From Swiss-Prot:
The lineage of its organism: Eukaryota, Metazoa, Chordata, Craniata, Vertebrata. Component of the HRD1 complex, which comprises at least SYNV1/HRD1, DERL1/2, FAM8A1, HERPUD1/HERP, OS9, SEL1L and UBE2J1. FAM8A1 is stabilized by interaction with SYNV1, which prevents its proteasomal degradation. OS9 and UBE2J1 recruitment to the complex may be mediated by SEL1L. Through this complex, may interact with ERLEC1 and HSPA5. Interacts (via C-terminus) with CPNE6 (via second C2 domain); this interaction occurs in a calcium-dependent manner in vitro. Interacts with CREB3. Residues 108-230 form the MRH domain. Residues 262-450, 506-541, 636-667 are annotated as: Disordered. This is Protein OS-9. Disulfide bonds join 110-123, 181-216, 196-228. One of its GO terms (biological process) is endoplasmic reticulum unfolded protein response. The gene is OS9. It comes from Bos taurus.
Length: 667
């Protein structure tokens, strides 16, 4: 698709860059197979643009998307200068050779591998057999896939030139002259490949796979920890993919416009930060306009009412205009000054009479409002005696309040009437529901009822998910600054809702049955089937523990399963349930965990299934699989979403994005 096309073109240019230096110097270009086999690349489409045509470096290539957006992609250093001198830089190995490392396998037991109908037996340095087993006994003919002939010579010059074993990091042996093949009449032959497996134990040799690429020609892959000390066979460190960084390439005028927009947005952000970090509001000053008493003494009542309304409007925006709070406080104190009609005072006396209140929190603002309301109630009778105009203007505003507060009996009567109407409506609804349930019981089968119950439950879960999404949108971004804190809050909310659903399912069902029995006679229903108990939340998580044990030499493995009554199984199930509830996860699908350790002989009853250390480590294993794996998947999804958004953006276009279908992007 689009991303694959872009990546393939980049890799093609990358290979061209590898070949180009050799052709310019007159040499012969060669394809570096070692690089392709051991290096991985990942493309990163970044949102930060660059000015096109400014970089002349050899590691920069120009590509274009399907929307004609040009990119400058910088190839990683490893793509241009791969480790061509790796062989020379390899430290000298002073340990035993590869044949010496594998020689202890001669005295070890033969390795067995069962695949479909056949069982394969490999005896190091001797032969390879194939036969069929039934009831731990060999049935039918034993076929020889080959006898030991030779081993790969690491010191041979021809072997060094092939580099096949060095690249694949395996040692091989050849087995031939086996049983005659019925298909082509030739003797069977096999190649055995030995690979390092650092995770296996001291004697952890095992046959990993058996392939038959050609008729009667076999390839056995054996993994063993014996070869890991050798540097040529030790697996390379798993390196992260080499990133190919691609920046949108803009024309000079587009790039300058982008830089100007960034500068403007930065200045706007700095101003906003400075506004938030302002110190305490400044105190009143005698130079402020509008606070000098002589000019305000002759103000009309209409102006005072407008000032009072402006004060309550400004209280709704306390943080945006902090200096105006003090002005409104001064204006609220002006009625007292006008009532007494004092002569003009000096600035010093004015400052002594001013009360400065600093509002630092919403609680302080509420207290200030209450004080101002109390002050106006106390001051209004005095002002009413000397200024009848004020009382005349304030009476209409008080009348609605008195009407609301003075009729509690009428309000109670209205509430009682509404309650009676609600009860009548509820009774009608109950009757309709009862008739509907009667009809359903006569029509629906028990399976249909279970299905309807499941659909109702699914609908409840969808509603809860919508509530969670709405809660996430309403979360204060300043209160939960870190994404991890927001995720933990959502998980905790999900866990709480799951517990509520569980309690509702446990408590509501018997209560509903009692209500139905009170209203009408219901025929007795048969007891619920065992399947319904398994659908209960208590049985959503089931742990199954099985043990594989050899029945004897050259015999099949016996499978033992832990009984449900085993207390150790109950302990493991409780551990998993607690982890799922705490992290707000649901149990979906199956998870298989294999614990490989030396087995003990004995029956199921006297054998210890899991050691204390195994049980202790299970919690960490579950956490890594369920929780940490989910977080990594979420991060990867977010990264892919950002890459797709960056790819769709077309710089300089009116809409700013391409017109491609979202489904066609698959990085």
């Amino acid at each position: 698709m689009a991303a694959e096309t872009l990546l393939s073109s980049l890799l093609g240019l990358l290979l061209l860059g590898l070949l180009l230096p050799a052709t310019l110097t007159g040499g012969v270009g060669s394809l570096n197979l070692e690089e392709l086999s051991e290096m991985r690349y990942g493309i990163e489409i970044l949102p930060l643009p660059v000015m096109g045509g400014q970089s002349q470096a050899s590691d920069v290539v120009i590509v274009s998307s399907k929307y004609k957006q040009r990119y400058e992609c910088r190839l990683p250093a490893g793509a241009i200068h791969f480790q061509r001198e790796r062989e020379e830089e390899t430290p000298a190995y002073q340990g035993p050779g590869i044949p010496e490392l594998l020689s202890p396998m001669k005295d070890a037991p033969c390795l067995l591998k069962t695949k479909d109908w056949w069982t394969y037996e490999f005896c190091y340095g001797r032969h390879i057999q194939q036969y069929h087993m039934e009831d731990s006994e060999i049935k039918g003919e034993v076929l020889y896939l080959g006898y030991y002939q030779s081993a790969f010579d690491w010191d041979d010059e021809t072997a060094k030139a092939s580099k096949q074993h060095r690249l694949k990091r395996y040692h091989s042996q050849t087995y031939g002259n086996g049983s005659k093949c019925d298909l082509n009449g030739r003797p069977r032959e096999a190649e055995v490949r030995f690979l390092c497996d650092e995770g296996a134990g001291i004697s952890g040799d095992y046959i990993d796979r058996v392939d038959e690429p050609l008729s009667c020609s076999y390839v056995l892959t054996i993994r063993t920890p014996r070869l890991c000390p050798h540097p040529l066979l030790r697996p390379p460190p798993s390196a992260a993919p080499q990133a190919i960084l691609c920046h949108p390439a803009l024309q000079p005028e587009e790039y300058m416009a982008y830089v100007q927009r960034q500068a403007d947005s930065k200045q706007y952000g700095d101003r906003a930060i400075e506004g938030r970090q302002d110190p305490d509001p400044p105190v009143w000053s005698e130079t402020k306009p509008g606070v000098v008493p002589p000019k305000k003494a002759g103000a009309s009542p209409a102006k005072e009412n407008s000032k009072e309304s402006d004060f309550w409007k400004m209280l709704h925006e306390p943080e945006e205009q902090p200096p105006e709070k003090e002005e409104t406080q001064a204006e609220e104190q002006e009625p007292n000054l006008e009532a007494t009609d004092p002569p003009p005072t000096s600035p010093d006396d004015f400052q002594n009479n001013v009360q400065v209140k600093v509002i630092r929190s919403p609680a302080d603002l509420i207290r200030l409002i209450e004080e101002l309301k109390g002050g106006t109630r106390k001051g209004k009778p005095n002002t009413g005696q000397e200024q009848p105009g004020d009382s005349a203007t304030e009476v209409p505003s008080r009348e609605p309040e008195m009407k609301e507060k003075g009729d509690p009996e009428q309000q109670n009567e209205v509430e009682e009437e509404e309650d009676d109407e609600d009860e009548d409506e509820d009774e009608d609804e109950r009757q309709l529901l009862g008739e509907f349930e009667k009809e359903l019981e006569g029509i629906l089968l028990p399976s249909d009822r279970e299905r309807l119950r499941a659909e109702v439950k699914a609908g409840m879960e969808r509603e809860l998910e919508n509530i969670i999404q709405e809660t996430e949108k309403e979360l204060d971004p300043d209160g939960l600054k870190k994404e991890s804190e927001r995720d933990r809050a959502i998980l905790a909310l999900t866990s709480t809702l799951n517990k509520l659903i569980k309690r509702l399912e446990e408590k509501q069902s018997p209560e509903l049955m009692k209500k139905h029995r009170k209203r009408r006679v219901v025929p007795k229903k048969p007891p619920p089937s065992p399947q319904s108990t398994e659908e209960d939340p208590e049985h959503r998580v089931r742990v199954r523990v099985t043990k594989l044990r050899h029945g004897g030499p050259n015999q099949d493995l016996t499978v033992l399963e832990m009984k449900r009554e085993n207390p150790q199984l109950k302990q493991i199930e409780g551990l998993v349930k607690d982890l799922l509830e705490r992290e707000g996860l649901t149990a979906e699908g199956k998870i298989e965990i294999k614990i490989v350790r030396p087995g003990t002989e004995g029956t199921e009853e006297d054998a210890r299934w899991l050691t204390d250390e195994d049980t202790k480590n299970l919690k960490e294993i579950f956490f890594n699989i369920l929780v940490q794996g989910a977080e990594e998947a979420q991060k990867e999804r977010q990264r892919q979403k950002e890459l797709e958004s960056n790819y769709r953006r077309v710089w300089g276009s009116p809409g700013g994005e391409g017109t491609g279908d979202l489904d066609e992007f698959d990085f």
